[in-house]
UniProtKB/Swiss-Prot annotation:
Function description: Involved in erythromycin resistance.
Top-level lineage group: Bacteria
One of the Pfam families matching this protein, by short name: RrnaAD
Cross-referenced PANTHER family: DIMETHYLADENOSINE TRANSFERASE (PTHR11727), DIMETHYLADENOSINE TRANSFERASE-RELATED (PTHR11727:SF7)
Keyword Magnesium: no
Biological-process GO terms, alphabetical: response to antibiotic
Name of the gene this protein is made from: ermK
Family per similarity comment: Belongs to the class I-like SAM-binding methyltransferase superfamily. rRNA adenine N(6)-methyltransferase family.
Name this protein carries in UniProt: rRNA adenine N-6-methyltransferase
Enzyme category, top tier: transferase
Species of provenance: Bacillus licheniformis
Length: 287
C-alpha cells in the first residue's frame, strides 16, 4: 500500500525552489547521526517528532528505534526522498508542512532533530512555552551561539529563565561545521533538553512567572534589590534576602531556578495580585 503524506495546503513550491526559510544544513556524517540517535535513548514506546527531516538521514535510524516517528519537512523534493526511504517503515509518518504551522502531538513525545538555524528560537518557544504539553525530552542540533545563550549560567532572557524552571537544558558537545552540507558559517552544538521530574513550580504558573521574569530581567546586571523593588516592599525584600541567603548586591541574572521559585512563591503569597507584573505580548519568533 502506498504511504500517504500529510500535505501542507499552502503555497506550493516550484521545482528547484527552496522553503521560505533559510538555515537548513543537512548532516552527512553517519557516526554523528548514530551518536545523536543513541544519545536520544529512545525505545519502541516513544513517539518521536523530527523537525526539519531533510533527506532522512536521521529519520531512517529513528524509524528503527521508535514506536512512532513524525517527520516534518517543508521542501517538496526532500519529502519525495523521505517517502521513498521510509516506505518500509509503517511507523513513520511524513508531514509535508512548515515546521511553525504544525500541531504538536497530544501524547507524550520526544524531539530528535537537526533544526533549521534560522528558526531556532521559534522552535524552542513552540516546544517549551507550554510546560503542560506532551514534550518530554529531546536531542536537538542547533547553532552553537544559540545553544550557549540557552544554557548560560548568567540568564539575560526571560523566556530562557522560564523554560529552565521546567526543563533542564545542556550542551552535550560541539559539532564542527564540516559535518554539514552545505556547511554553515558557524559551528553547531548538540543540546539535550529534559523535563524536570521535580520542577520548582507547577506548570499552571508559567504565564505569571514569565511576567515576573520579564520585569526582573529588564536589566540582568542589576542588583537584586534594584531589580525587584517595584514589586516587593522593603520588609518583604528583607524577608526574601534571608530566605535566599543573599545580599542586596546579588546580580539578578545569576539567581538559580530554585531561588526564582522562592521569589515567585513569596510574590504570590504576600504581594497583592494587582501588583504582579504582567507578561508582554510578543510577535511570533520574538524573544
Amino acid at each position: 500500500m502506498k504511504k500517504k503524506n500529510h500535505k501542507y495546503r499552502g503555497k506550493k513550491l516550484n521545482r528547484g525552489e527552496y522553503p521560505n526559510f533559510s538555515g537548513q544544513h543537512l548532516m552527512h556524517n553517519k557516526k554523528l547521526i548514530e551518536e545523536i540517535v543513541d544519545r536520544a535513548n529512545i525505545s519502541i514506546d516513544d513517539t518521536v517528532l523530527e523537525l526539519g527531516a531533510g533527506k532522512g538521514a536521521l529519520t531512517t535510524m529513528l524509524s528503527q528505534k521508535a514506536g512512532k516517528v513524525l517527520a516534518v519537512e517543508n521542501d517538496s523534493k526532500f519529502v519525495a526522498i523521505l517517502t521513498r526511504k521510509t516506505a518500509q517503515h509503517p511507523n513513520t509518518k511524513i508531514i509535508h508542512q512548515d515546521i511553525m504551522k504544525i500541531h504538536l502531538p497530544k501524547e507524550k513525545f520526544v524531539v530528535v532533530s537537526n533544526i533549521p538555524y534560522a528558526i531556532t528560537t521559534p522552535i524552542m518557544k513552540m516546544l517549551l512555552n507550554n510546560p503542560a504539553s506532551g514534550f518530554q525530552k529531546g536531542i536537538i542540533v542547533m547553532e552553537k551561539g544559540a545553544a550557549k545563550r540557552f544554557t548560560s549560567k548568567f540568564i539575560k532572557n526571560s523566556y530562557v529563565l522560564a523554560w529552565r524552571m521546567w526543563f533542564d537544558i545542556g550542551i552535550v558537545r560541539e559539532i564542527s561545521k564540516e559535518h554539514f552540507s552545505p556547511p554553515p558559517k558557524v559551528d553547531s552544538a548538540m543540546v539535550r533538553i529534559t523535563r524536570k521530574k521535580d520542577a520548582p513550580l507547577s506548570h499552571k504558573h508559567y504565564i505569571a512567572f514569565l511576567g515576573l521574569a520579564e520585569y526582573a530581567l529588564k536589566e540582568p546586571q542589576a542588583p537584586f534589590c534594584v531589580a525587584l523593588r517595584g514589586i516587593f516592599t522593603p520588609r518583604q525584600m528583607k524577608h526574601l534576602r534571608k530566605s535566599l541567603k543573599i545580599n542586596n548586591e546579588k546580580t539578578v541574572g545569576t539567581l538559580t531556578e530554585n531561588q526564582w521559585a522562592v521569589i515567585f512563591n513569596t510574590m504570590t503569597q504576600y504581594v497583592m495580585h494587582h501588583k504582579w507584573p504582567r507578561a508582554n505580548k510578543r510577535k511570533p519568533g520574538e524573544i
